[in-house]
Amino acid sequence: MEETSSLARSRRMGEMPEGKLLLSMAVPMMLSMLVQALYNIVDSVYVARVSEDCLSALSLAFPAQNILIGLGTGTGVGVSTMLSRSLGSRDNKLANRVAGNSLFLCVCCWIIMAVFGIFFADAFIRSQTDIESIRSYGDSYLRIVTIGSVFVYFEINFERLLQSTGQTKLSMWAQMIGAVANIILDPFFIYGWCGLPAMGTTGAAIATVIGQAFGALAGFLFHHKHNKEVNIRLSDCRPDGHIILDIYRIGFPSILMVGIGSLTNYLMNRILMAFTSTAVAVYGAYFKLQSFFFMPVFGLNNGIVPIVGYNYGARKKERIYRTIRYGVLYAVCILAVGLLLFEAIPGVLLQAFSPSENMLAIGIPALRRIAVHFPIAAFCIVGGSICQALGKSLYSFFTSVIRQIVALIPAAYLLSLTGSVGNVWWCFPIAEVVSACATAFFLRRALRDMDRKLTLSEE
């Protein structure tokens, strides 16, 4: 029965029409990402009702928190790609060893972030602001989420193991369980419901960690019961240098890209803080709102990568090209909806964060100017995931460097010299146009290299 189920899933990955296959795999992950985006917004909405300083504090903590998540997702990219290739080439023994080593790497990632939280969280927040209330809120939040990050790493890992074998619905449920638990617990810990002490940002961090623990437990149970293609034994968890190297050869550029993104957010916070802390709050609110549209695209990517990886291992070139076309089309449609809403009702969107008049004055034009780049970003995001699935993760890394270090931050700094915070927001469309050119160049090279390798293998 298990072999029959495995064979059916393998045939689906290699034979089902690409558009239908992509939707069947991506929609559950897109829905789970929407739940995650809802959590991100609700978390900030709760905190914003305490004070604008609390919202600013979470914005200042975001770069470090983003690295925390990026370390897990980058590792997951490598694990997912290697698993998909191993299963596509029918090497189940290697797939088991990859999955086992991924558990070892979860513990390593947690140790790194826990050390950062214990010794460097306060210094990180202080480097961005000298406002004592914001510093205190940010330090307490960041310290707790980093020390408790062990759960998010196992949650991400089990979700990736499920996704790599086509169990995307179970992956969605694991993430939804964690996110919903977080949403439910937030007001209890933030406002002090049912006799609990009101803890503000500290309470938000505690609710986050508990929600991640629920997600990790659900992911483990789903994997243990349903993921029959991957059978992890204790011996598979023994560190294997070659496997770990291969995982990070694929995933490390993704981690570096997140690191660059976090550096970009950090520098943007400093640029905006020179105007007012309200601009930082607007920047944080924007990130929460845009996640409603970008997170589904990232969920779409999680469907694209295993399909491309499997068919690359199975040497089915035409299926790869059709998957790319469908992926770009779906991503552009999603972000076009985001563009329309950001342009039409920015004030309504910002009302979720209990904005002051000053926050609305800064935020409404900010959302309209930033959103111009959304459809262009769709192509860049999908193009980067295709490069990763084809083993060309460095191309995605170079594109990210060009977008954020070469274009975004210099543009933001130069625009800030005009003395108007409103002009700074134009740096996003400028950077995305540059990024699209770089993505087109590198994606073409990756596909040309794939064509050459597959042609040689056929000979």
Please annotate each region the language model reported.
Residues 31, 43-47, 58, 83, ...:
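Hydrophobic/aromatic residues within transmembrane alpha-helices of membrane transport systems
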Residues 55-115, 152-171, 269, 282-340, ...:
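Small-residue-rich hydrophobic transmembrane alpha-helices
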Residues 1-26, 83-150, 196-252, 308-373, ...:
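Short alpha-helical transmembrane segments in multi-pass integral membrane proteins
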Residues 52-63, 138, 142, 205, ...:
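Small-residue hotspots at the loop-to-helix junctions and early N-terminal turns
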Residues 34, 38-56, 125-132, 188-199, ...:
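Helix-terminus/linker motif at the lipid-water interface of multi-pass membrane proteins
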Residues 24-43, 144, 178, 211-215, ...:
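Transmembrane helical elements of multi-pass membrane transporters/channels
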Residues 76, 145-163, 171-179, 204-217, ...:
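Short runs within selected transmembrane alpha-helices of multi-pass transporters and secretion channels
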Residues 19-38, 42, 64-71, 147, ...:
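Residue-level signal for short hydrophobic patches within transmembrane helices
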